[in-house]
């Protein structure tokens, strides 16, 4: 059965390109895994797939199994140990702060990704397809990928409302249900709704209004709006400066009668993380290259081999997305 093992499907939509939709998708996926959920990310931005680059796995390739295509693993689930359970019980007897630490220390879920970027021979190859071929590719992604047991499947979509969105909506409404009563073994996956991503500017929020109308016309519930790039946080003093404006997404959500999930200022640390740089790297690229050359010659190059999810916990934006993840879990699972 297509989408077998998937419990909930969330679409990530945006009206315009460049609002950070793919980075929001990834951060929400990482935050959900840190809540103990197994997560899949399906990238259907066929002409501009970003997920392989963001997770640092551009060289990965899709493998085939008897059940279908196997998604690329970003990190595996962390098993709960007996000693971990004992520690949790011991700490829970001490009260307040310790209980919060135990809650944060819950075993993380797995994260897997599927993208056309993994199927291209070269990452620079252009995808020049007409609508019917895009539609066929999206249907194949939805029917031929074996996700296994997955709590949440996040679908990273292209900006706007294009052929991809129409094909996705039509196929998902056949393969899933929007009813919250769909539970149990053999039940259809639940299309829980869409998260809309915008920046504060009016030119972006005006296009997100079209996404809200798209959801209404296709009977896809709207879970909420995230206002991305809502200011810049100085890494030295922590002061937030509004580079563009602020509050546009919140005003739009209120006017459209949609839940406003929150604002996310620009996180320089997350940008460095997905670009493969450390926070301490110099802004002077020439000096940086020279230093790396010397370190390589000395064999002293430091490579942080921790999983992406563990390094992400050090980004201050993790706190924002942890809140979004908890809100969505509470809304969806009750």
Swiss-Prot record:
GO terms for biological process: iron-sulfur cluster assembly; tRNA wobble uridine modification. Binds 4 [4Fe-4S] clusters per heterotetramer. Contains two stable clusters in the N-termini of nbp35 and two labile, bridging clusters between subunits of the nbp35-cfd1 heterotetramer. The keyword Nucleotide-binding applies. Keywords: 4Fe-4S, ATP-binding, Cytoplasm, Iron, Iron-sulfur, Metal-binding, Nucleotide-binding. One of its GO terms (molecular function) is ATP hydrolysis activity. Its main location: cytoplasm. [4Fe-4S] cluster binds at residues 234, 237. ATP binds at residues 15-22. Pfam families: ParA (PF10609). It is found in: Cytoplasm. Residues 274-302 are annotated as: Disordered. Residues 289-302 have a biased composition (Basic and acidic residues). GO terms for cellular component: cytosol; cytosolic [4Fe-4S] assembly scaffold complex. Its cofactor is [4Fe-4S] cluster. Heterotetramer of 2 nbp35 and 2 cfd1 chains. Component of the cytosolic iron-sulfur (Fe/S) protein assembly (CIA) machinery. Required for maturation of extramitochondrial Fe-S proteins. The nbp35-cfd1 heterotetramer forms a Fe-S scaffold complex, mediating the de novo assembly of an Fe-S cluster and its transfer to target apoproteins. Belongs to the Mrp/NBP35 ATP-binding proteins family. NUBP2/CFD1 subfamily. This is Cytosolic Fe-S cluster assembly factor cfd1. The gene is cfd1.
């Amino acid at each position: 059965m297509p989408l077998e093992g998937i419990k909930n499907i969330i679409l990530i939509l945006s009206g315009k390109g460049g609002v950070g939709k793919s980075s929001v998708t990834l951060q929400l996926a990482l935050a959900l895994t840190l809540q103990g959920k197994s997560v899949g990310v399906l990238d259907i931005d066929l002409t501009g797939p970003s997920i392989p680059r963001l997770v640092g796995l551009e060289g990965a390739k899709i493998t085939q199994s008897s059940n279908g295509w196997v998604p690329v693993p970003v990190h595996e689930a962390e098993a709960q140990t007996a000693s971990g359970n004992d520690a949790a019980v011991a700490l829970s007897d001490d009260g307040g702060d310790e209980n919060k630490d135990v809650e944060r220390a819950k075993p993380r879920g797995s994260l897997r990704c599927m993208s056309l970027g993994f199927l291209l021979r070269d990452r620079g190859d252009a995808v020049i397809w007409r609508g019917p071929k895009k539609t066929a590719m999206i249907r194949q992604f939805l029917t031929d990928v074996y996700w296994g047991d997955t709590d949440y499947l996040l679908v990273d979509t292209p900006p706007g409302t294009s052929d991809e969105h129409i094909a996705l909506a039509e196929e998902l409404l056949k393969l899933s249900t929007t009813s919250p009563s769909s539970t149990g073994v053999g039940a259809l996956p639940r299309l829980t709704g869409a998260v809309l991503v915008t920046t504060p500017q009016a030119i972006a929020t005006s296009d997100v209004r079209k996404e809200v109308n798209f959801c209404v016309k296709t009977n896809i519930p709207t879970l909420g709006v995230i206002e991305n790039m809502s200011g810049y946080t100085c890494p030295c003093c922590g002061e937030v400066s509004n580079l563009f404006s602020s509050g546009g997404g919140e005003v739009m959500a209120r006017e459209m009668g949609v839940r406003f999930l929150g604002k996310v200022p620009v996180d320089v640390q997350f940008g460095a993380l997905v670009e493969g740089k450390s926070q301490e790297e110099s802004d002077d690229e020439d000096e940086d290259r020279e230093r790396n050359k010397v370190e390589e010659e000395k064999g002293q190059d430091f490579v942080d081999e921790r999983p992406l999810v563990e390094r992400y916990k050090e980004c201050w934006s993790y706190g924002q997305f942890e809140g979004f993840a908890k809100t969505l879990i509470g809304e969806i699972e009750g």
